[in-house]
């Protein structure tokens, strides 16, 4: 079946979403056009409003509708702690823990094969943020992937010798998890990152 130009454009636009392939995009497009036009229009309006109204916080670079995000605008937060994350979703995840320090949001992780070097992900801006701040500890909360580990290692080397405490988030056995269900790599990290019981 050959789709009209407008339907093809809608399908291709839906394919930019993560995890949405050709067939899923076709189903979504046809469902919106056949069964839920008002929902489709509502989606289009919300998408337009978000694309026009959401930018980046000038201080931490997370997504924000204001010049400063709520975390950066809050004077009660701990100015001595800086948590470095890969993206805005990571800020949301860390916020759920009750963390009360400041953030810096990279634009992903180092990935030379994808052309993502230090400048592309914002390392110079991170250096400026640290230089201009009063931080005593930098928490490297990049993802526990090969690229996330490489990014954390690169940042740690860059910041070494600046009088900062550099820490890495722990990773390993999930709370409530059973050892027999944990993969070998995760268990190895958990054993390497063990801590004494006081």
Curated annotation (Swiss-Prot):
Record keyword Iron present: no
An individual GO BP term: DNA recombination
SUPFAM superfamilies named in the record: Recombination protein RecR
Alphabetized UniProt keyword annotations: DNA damage, DNA recombination, DNA repair, Metal-binding, Zinc, Zinc-finger
Domain annotation Toprim: ranges: 80-174
Zinc fingers (C4-type) by residue: 57-72
Family named by the database record: Belongs to the RecR family.
Function as written in the Swiss-Prot or TrEMBL entry: May play a role in DNA repair. It seems to be involved in an RecBC-independent recombinational process of DNA repair. It may act with RecF and RecO.
Protein name, entry field: Recombination protein RecR
Source organism: Pseudomonas aeruginosa (strain UCBPP-PA14)
């Amino acid at each position: 079946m050959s789709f009209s130009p407008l339907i093809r454009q809608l399908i291709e636009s839906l394919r930019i979403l993560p995890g949405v392939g050709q067939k899923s995009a076709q189903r979504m497009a046809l469902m919106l056009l056949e069964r839920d036009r008002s929902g489709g229009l509502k989606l289009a309006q919300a998408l337009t409003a978000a694309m026009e109204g959401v930018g980046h916080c000038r201080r931490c670079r997370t997504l924000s509708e204001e010049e400063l995000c709520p975390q950066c605008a809050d004077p009660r937060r701990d100015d001595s702690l800086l948590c470095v994350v890969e993206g805005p979703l990571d800020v949301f995840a860390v916020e759920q823990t009750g963390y009360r320090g400041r953030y810096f949001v990279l634009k992903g992780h180092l990935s030379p094969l994808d052309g993502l070097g230090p400048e592309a992900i914002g390392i110079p801006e991170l250096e400026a943020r640290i230089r201009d701040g009063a931080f005593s500890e930098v928490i490297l909360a990049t993802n526990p992937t090969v690229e996330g580990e490489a990014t954390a290692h690169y940042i740690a080397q860059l910041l070494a010798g600046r009088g900062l405490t550099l820490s890495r988030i722990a990773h390993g056995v999930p709370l409530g998890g059973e050892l027999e269900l944990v993969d070998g790599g995760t268990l190895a990290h958990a054993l390497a990152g063990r801590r004494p019981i006081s």
